[in-house]
Every structure is written in C-alpha cells, then in structure tokens.
C-alpha cells in the first residue's frame, strides 16, 4: 500500500503562468492529471487524463493522495437527488493530500501542509447561516464532488477557509474517510444531546458511516447497540466497540429486541443507513424523551411517526447534515489521538467503477479508499 513521504516545503515567488499569480512548490505542477469523470448522470465513469484545475485567489490546490468513497458519490453520479449536479463532474469529497499551490489571497496555509477536501468546499461566509457556523446550510454552498469537481483526481481545489487541516505525519489513507463520514457521524452524535452512559443505536452500523459512528460513540462514553444485517457485520460492530448487535435479517421483532437490550429503548438513534423502513422503525423503539437523528439520504424517502406515540413519548426527530469547521477539527483530533480508526480497503482510482457496483449491492464493510496514483 502506498504511503506518502514528506513533501518539500520549497516555495517559489509569486509568479504568473499557467496558474496565474499563485504560490507553488518549486517543482512544477503538471498541466494534466489522472481522474475519473462522467459527462451525464448515470453515464460511463471514465478514468482518463484531464486538466489540472487552476486555484482561484481564495483557494488552495491539493495534490490528492487518497480519497474515500461515500454513498453520496453514488447519488451524485446517478443524479437522483433534488439538487442538480455540475456536469461534467469529477466526484469525491473525502480527499487527503498535500498543498502544492495557493491563490494570492490565501493566508494561514503553507506549501507542504497536509490538507483535506470535505463535502463543503466553500460558502459565502456572510449569510445568517455562515455567521452562526452553519456553513453547510448556506444558500451558496459549493459542494465537492457535486457542484465543484472533487477528489477523484490527483489535484483538486478547495476554499482555503473550509479546507480541513490535517496534522503532519497523519496516515492520509486512513484519515480520508474522516473528512466526511467521520465528521458527519460525529456531528450527528453531538446533535443527539446524549450524556456518558446513555444508550445509542446505530442503524447501518457496519457501513462506511456506521463503522465510524460506533467508534465515535464509544469514545464519547456512550453504550452502543449496532443494527445491520449479517453475521460478518455483527462481528465488525463488536470489534469496533459495540456492546450489542441486532441482525435485522434474523430478528423476529426488532423493536422489542432493541428495547429489551437497552432497558426501554436507546436514548438516541443515529440513522446512517439508506433504508426508509429502518428510519421509521427507529421512531418506535427510541426511548421516551429520546432523539432520532436522520443522516442517511435514501432518494424519495419519507419518515413517519405515529402522532399519539410521538407526543406521549415526547421524542425528538431531527436531521443532521455535515459538520462545520469546529466539528471537523474535533473529529480529526479523535482520529489523530487514536480513539477512532478507519476500517478501510485501498484500491486504485481506476477501480472506482467496481467500488460503485459493490456499494450499490450493499457489499461493503467499512470504507473503500482510492489511491490516486493508479
């Protein structure tokens, strides 16, 4: 498995050329690169030579070494969400690499810094939502691998304000999934307003998001019951710190089983699966005064909660999107301090179409990460 060596921190003067007035590594940035691109939703995923993007004055250019593969990438390719994608599009929003160039207005970054590309590539930073640190809700949010070419390429741009700061010496392959999956589930767990010792159910516990959610929940002091299908997935959940596991393919009464394990229902439920049925079941087994957090985004899904039960049990149902800059810093710190590990499988970027097939079939344990060098 390829591992990154230290980047040279040699900075050239501001210069004009193919990339305008920017600061770059003394070694030249190439004009072309390898990437995976599609020209229509659901169209062929082409691994080919494409131009290296030019960073704007407020952007950094990152030499992406590794990128996680997220279920959102599948939706972007299919185009089955209400928000239209940029076309043609390079997907990906979990890119980890090295800063090799910076726009003339960028401050606080150095050539050679480790940096990450998140789902939120940039925002206006002046609207009500941005002022309250809810940048992901900005009406002008720019989304990596959706409205902005993402990390399934060797070089990608990111707004210098939103790019994730990764500590030097970090394993870039393992940290890649933290940039979206890790931040997303960490924010969701915070949104559940739990306290140490509380039970939390993770629906979709063995997948890319779920496998990280189990670990973050454990590190935050919660008791975890994982929900997923299959013996192999149950073993993974237990290995990652889950106290109990419910196999939805075998249980006769999932609601009753979860409530029995948790002595009345979990205090919080984090729904990271893309199952509408699983989301609706969570409103039934959550503990009175508990919180159901919706994270997974199955196309066209509707969550239903029986009103009498909802009111009498005084439950909360809320959505949780990606985290802000503080959430990102905290989520990365959990990883850097060894509290969270990414169960990953690394394959070449050229194999991305095969990864999409496995994802569609629900056959992925943990997270796939692509190595952009092949």
From Swiss-Prot:
Residues bound to Zn(2+) 1 are: 70, 93, 180
E.C. designation(s)? 1.1.1.1
Which molecular-function annotations from GO does this UniProt entry contain?
A: alcohol dehydrogenase (NAD+) activity; zinc ion binding
Mind telling me where the transit peptide is? 1-26
Where is it chiefly localized? Answer: mitochondrion
As given in the record, the signal peptide range reads none
Gene3D superfamilies per the UniProt record, alphabetical: Medium-chain alcohol dehydrogenases, catalytic domain (3.90.180.10), NAD(P)-binding Rossmann-like Domain (3.40.50.720)
Q: Where in the cell is it found?
A: Mitochondrion matrix
Cofactor binding annotation: Binds 2 Zn(2+) ions per subunit.
Query: InterPro entries annotated for this entry?
Result: ADH-like_C, ADH-like_N, ADH_Zn_CS, GroES-like_sf, NAD(P)-bd_dom_sf, PKS_ER
- Pfam families, alphabetically? ADH_N, ADH_zinc_N
What residues bind Zn(2+) 2, as annotated? 124, 127, 130, 138
Query: Does the record carry Flavoprotein as a key word?
Result: no
Entry's family note: Belongs to the zinc-containing alcohol dehydrogenase family.
- The identity of this protein, by name, is Alcohol dehydrogenase 3, mitochondrial
Organism equals Kluyveromyces lactis (strain ATCC 8585 / CBS 2359 / DSM 70799 / NBRC 1267 / NRRL Y-1140 / WM37)
Name the gene: ADH3
């Amino acid at each position: 498995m390829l591992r990154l060596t230290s980047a040279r921190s040699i900075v050239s003067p501001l210069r004009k050329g193919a990339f305008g007035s920017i600061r770059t590594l003394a070694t030249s940035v190439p004009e072309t690169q390898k990437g995976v691109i599609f020209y229509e939703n659901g169209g062929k995923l082409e691994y080919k030579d494409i131009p290296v993007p030019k960073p704007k004055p407020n952007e950094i250019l990152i030499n992406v070494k590794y990128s996680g593969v997220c279920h959102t990438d599948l939706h972007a390719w299919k185009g089955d969400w209400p928000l239209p994608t940029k076309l043609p599009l390079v997907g990906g929003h979990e890119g980890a690499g090295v800063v090799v160039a910076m726009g003339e207005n960028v401050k606080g970054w150095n050539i050679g810094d480790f940096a990450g590309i998140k789902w939120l590539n940039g925002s206006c930073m002046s609207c009500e939502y941005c002022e309250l640190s809810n940048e992901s809700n900005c009406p002008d949010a720019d989304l990596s691998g959706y409205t902005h070419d993402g990390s399934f390429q060797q070089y990608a741009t990111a707004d210098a304000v939103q790019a994730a700061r990764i500590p030097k010496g970090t394993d870039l392959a393992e940290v890649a999934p933290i940039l979206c999956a890790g931040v997303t589930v960490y924010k969701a767990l915070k949104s559940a307003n739990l306290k140490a010792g509380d039970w939390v159910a993770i629906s979709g516990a063995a997948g890319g998001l779920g496998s990280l959610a189990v670990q973050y929940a454990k590190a935050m002091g919660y008791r975890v019951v994982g929900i997923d299908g299959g013996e192999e997935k149950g073993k993974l959940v237990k290995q990652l710190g889950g106290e109990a596991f419910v196999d939805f393919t075998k249980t006769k009464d999932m609601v009753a089983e979860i409530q029995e394990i948790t002595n009345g229902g979990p205090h919080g439920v984090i729904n990271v699966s893309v199952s509408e049925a699983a989301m609706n079941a969570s409103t039934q087994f959550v503990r009175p005064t508990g919180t159901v957090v919706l994270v997974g985004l199955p196309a066209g899904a509707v969550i239903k909660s029986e009103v009498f039960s909802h009111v009498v049990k005084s439950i909360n149902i809320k959505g949780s999107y990606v985290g802000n800059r503080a959430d990102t810093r905290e989520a990365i710190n959990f990883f850097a301090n060894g509290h969270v590990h990414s169960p990953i499988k690394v394959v070449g970027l050229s194999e991305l179409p095969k990864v999409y097939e496995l994802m569609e079939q629900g056959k992925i344990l943990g997270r796939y990460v692509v190595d952009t060098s092949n």
